[in-house]
Amino acid sequence: MRILIATDAWHPQVNGVVRTLTSLARSAAGLGVDIDFLTPDGFPSMGLPTYPGLRIALPNRREIAKRIEAIAPDAIHIATEGPIGWAARAYCRRRKLAFTTSYTTRFPEYVEVRTGIPASVGYAVLRHFHAAASMIMVATDSLKAELGARGFKKLGFWTRGVDTDLFNPDSPAELDLPRPIFMTMGRVAVEKNIEAFLSLNLPGTKVVVGDGPQRAELERKYPQVKFLGEKKGQDLTSHLAAADVFVFPSKTDTFGVVQLEALACGTPVAAFPVTGPLDVIADHPIGAIDENLQSACLRALGMSRETCRNFALERSWENSARQFIGNLTALQPSRSLRPTSRVVAGRTAVRG
């Protein structure tokens, strides 16, 4: 089986969507499934308004068609609702090709925070985008319930995993900082609600790993906080393993893969009781969720690092990949995905 995933989020971006897609492809290959990507690479781009450090592609119809037809996939999945996602959707609609989508980012809330455009407008746009899909994949029960209440249909599950070989507690970084260390990691941007963490009265040291448009402002405002910049690979793992508590202040993520990455490093998580933490942490003894984030941070201190690690060991990317592939396989050929007689680049396309 050959799957094409269209995504606006791609390297060199460092975020949960990119990590999810690359981990999915690696695990799917081990199951005998090839995943190709339609990405912004090779297209003209422009800086995203209000976030110039993040660039968005400007795809053209002919090149989109050329790339898809060169791959000739058995199934098409659209992972993002940016220009690449809309272009892939338009291609499928023109040719009556079935496709699935996933809901991974709260763009309506992001846009509202940055521009003041009501989230209700954004959700109307996203309902239209996803309505044409054979299935909208979501990662958690709480997100499925929320989107269902907002009028989204044909919702299915695709959970997330963690690379427990990469993320492990074996070699924590030697941080010469007062303990306990409360750490957050991710894009330093207003929609991540990092200031809710930085403003807390906590013992020890607060540490921020990551970069983004709000970093300079927050460094000036909170000089006592240690900003370490972007970390990758083993360097990231060692820093997560060095923390006493991982703090996840975001209220706009749809899952928060970094929670599993911290847990795999043996680090308990503190978070607000919102989609993502409610599903990952819940009432497991691996962290604390509370509307009072300070209380959650202090309660998470001292939780068993071994329990955190064991919890993560049960969440593999292979299981996530099996679920994703199963969603696509279930749609062929008895539902909307059926082989067509049109052969492109030596492979058979799918037509709905």
Identify the function of each model-found stretch.
Residues 174-207:
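Conserved donor-binding/catalytic core segment of Leloir-type glycosyltransferases
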Residues 98-100, 109-128:
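Nucleotide-sugar donor phosphate/pyrophosphate-binding loop at the beta->alpha transition
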Residues 259, 264, 268-271:
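Short hydrophobic beta-strand element within catalytic cores of glycosyltransferases
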